[in-house]
């Protein structure tokens, strides 16, 4: 499904003298009214430049920023994005202080040829997400008639639609699934995400290894279930490993994370792994702390000793690291979602950093490596390893839902190649 959707290269001949409406993900962090990290803006620059090369009548960009919950909140305005976007494109960008309505429609219609317009935050309107939070703090559903009008107004701002916002592809929001044009194409950033994930999930080079981390088993049940249908080996680390270890080996886990709900389903997951012939790797030794803080005292324990009361499992030990490295060395496709320990604290980051080093080495030897999920992406950026892996996903929630086997509304809505 993922590879059947049209991209910018399929629609180049349709762009000249047409106005392109493009959904981007410019949800960037701001500091004192300036863009703090432009990575997401940079991500869509190739798509924007390619569209501009085709001499469109104009290009209208729309995005959300932050969580204004359907209200106009000035600190979430898109306006600070303009100078950074102008700098990256080397050309002027016009900012409109709304995203729908008569004034916006008029301004777009009367804009000069080839003009780039950035609309105000889509989420200032309840109709974008289909809900808002009122003055009393209650969640309220948006009026369905108003949602239709909102979508109609957005649609009128272009002749064809390009979506480059992978980060919100798992949301059935108006700007993702409500723009009613025959041509609905993926931008380069979105297409790159889909190409990497479709290859890994539909036709991976084997052995296929998935590395999972995170705190709670119950949050990852669907992910584990889905990946057991696809992979050859699975590393389970991070906080959720202790729930597995307690169930399998009945060891003491001290004050380590324990997920009671997830505990009940461990047997079921292990049975499926056995039936599917998937080799599961769990920690065999651990670095523990007497607190979560940077100044925590540390001690090492293993499966034989268990973890005494007062100690928390916070990272993989050397034997576990060696076993994980061997699994990585065998793999030709690696998908990694979730760090192996409390990587925010340097002394508990070693297991994750070591694993990343081996993933980078294996990538340099020809394996495909995909990094997804906010924490793992942060780790890769901290270690300056972005260029050492095949692909760092820009969408935490979207990549997780893809791996869980879910259909992403924003992707499903794109035009199929055979419909063009």
Swiss-Prot record:
Residues holding CDP: 214, 219, 238, 338, 343
Reaction catalysed by this enzyme: (2R)-3-phosphoglycerate + ATP = (2R)-3-phospho-glyceroyl phosphate + ADP
Cofactor: Mg(2+)
Residues noted as binding (2R)-3-phosphoglycerate in the record, renumbered to the chain: 24-27, 40, 63-64, 66-67, 122-123, 170-171
Keyword S-adenosyl-L-methionine annotated: no
Listed pathway(s): Carbohydrate degradation; glycolysis; pyruvate from D-glyceraldehyde 3-phosphate: step 2/5
Entry GO terms, CC: cytosol
GO MF entries: ADP binding; ATP binding; metal ion binding; phosphoglycerate kinase activity
Superkingdom of the organism of origin: Eukaryota
CDD domains membership: Phosphoglycerate_kinase (cd00318)
EC number, as in UniProt: 2.7.2.3
GO terms of biological process kind: gluconeogenesis; glycolytic process
Binding locations of ATP: 215, 220, 239, 313, 344, 375-376
Keywords assigned: ATP-binding, Glycolysis, Kinase, Magnesium, Metal-binding, Nucleotide-binding, Transferase
Family, as annotated: Belongs to the phosphoglycerate kinase family.
Subunit structure: Monomer.
PANTHER family, per database record: PHOSPHOGLYCERATE KINASE (PTHR11406:SF0)
Protein name: Phosphoglycerate kinase
Naturally occurring in which organism (per UniProt): Tetrahymena thermophila
Organism classification: Eukaryota, Sar, Alveolata, Ciliophora, Intramacronucleata
Gene name of this polypeptide: PGK
């Amino acid at each position: 499904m993922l590879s059947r959707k049209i991209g910018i290269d399929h629609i180049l001949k349709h762009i000249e003298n047409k106005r392109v409406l493009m959904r981007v993900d410019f949800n960037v962090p701001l500091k004192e009214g300036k863009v703090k990290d432009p990575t997401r803006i940079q991500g869509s620059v190739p798509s924007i430049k390619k569209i501009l090369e085709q001499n469109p009548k104009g290009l209208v960009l729309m995005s959300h920023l932050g969580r204004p919950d359907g209200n106009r909140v000035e600190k979430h305005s898109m306006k600070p994005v303009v100078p950074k976007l102008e700098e990256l494109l080397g050309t002027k960008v016009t900012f409109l202080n709304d995203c729908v309505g008569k004034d916006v429609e008029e301004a777009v219609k009367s804009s000069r040829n080839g003009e780039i317009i950035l609309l105000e935050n889509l989420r200032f309107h309840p109709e974008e997400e289909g809900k808002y939070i009122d003055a009393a703090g209650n969640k309220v559903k948006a009026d369905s008639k108003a949602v239709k009008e909102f979508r109609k107004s957005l649609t009128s701002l272009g002749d064809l639609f390009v979506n480059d916002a992978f980060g919100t592809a798992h949301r059935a929001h108006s700007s993702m699934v409500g723009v009613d044009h025959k041509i609905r194409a993926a931008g380069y950033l979105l297409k790159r995400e889909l190409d990497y994930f479709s290859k890994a999930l539909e036709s991976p080079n084997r052995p296929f290894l998935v590395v999972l981390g995170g705190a709670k088993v119950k949050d990852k049940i669907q992910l584990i279930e889905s990946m057991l249908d696809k992979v050859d080996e699975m590393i389970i680390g991070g906080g959720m490993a202790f729930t597995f270890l307690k169930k399998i080996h009945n060891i003491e886990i001290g004050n380590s994370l324990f997920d009671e709900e997830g505990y009940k389903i461990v047997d079921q997951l292990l049975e499926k792994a056995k039936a599917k012939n998937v080799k599961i790797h769990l920690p065999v030794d651990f670095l523990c702390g007497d607190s979560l803080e940077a100044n925590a005292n540390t001690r090492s324990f293993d499966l034989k000793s268990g973890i005494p009361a007062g100690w928390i499992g916070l990272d993989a030990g050397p034997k576990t690291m060696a076993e994980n490295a061997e699994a990585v060395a065998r793999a030709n496709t690696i998908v990694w979602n979730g760090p192996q320990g409390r990587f925010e604290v340097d002394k508990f980051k070693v297991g994750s950093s070591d694993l990343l080093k081996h993933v980078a080495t294996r990538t340099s030897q020809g394996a495909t490596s995909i990094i997804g999920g906010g924490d793992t992406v942060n780790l890769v950026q901290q270690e300056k390893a972005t260029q050492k892996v095949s692909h760092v996903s820009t969408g935490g929630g979207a990549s997780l839902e893809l791996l869980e086997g879910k259909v992403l509304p924003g992707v499903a809505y794109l035009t199929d190649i055979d419909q063009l």
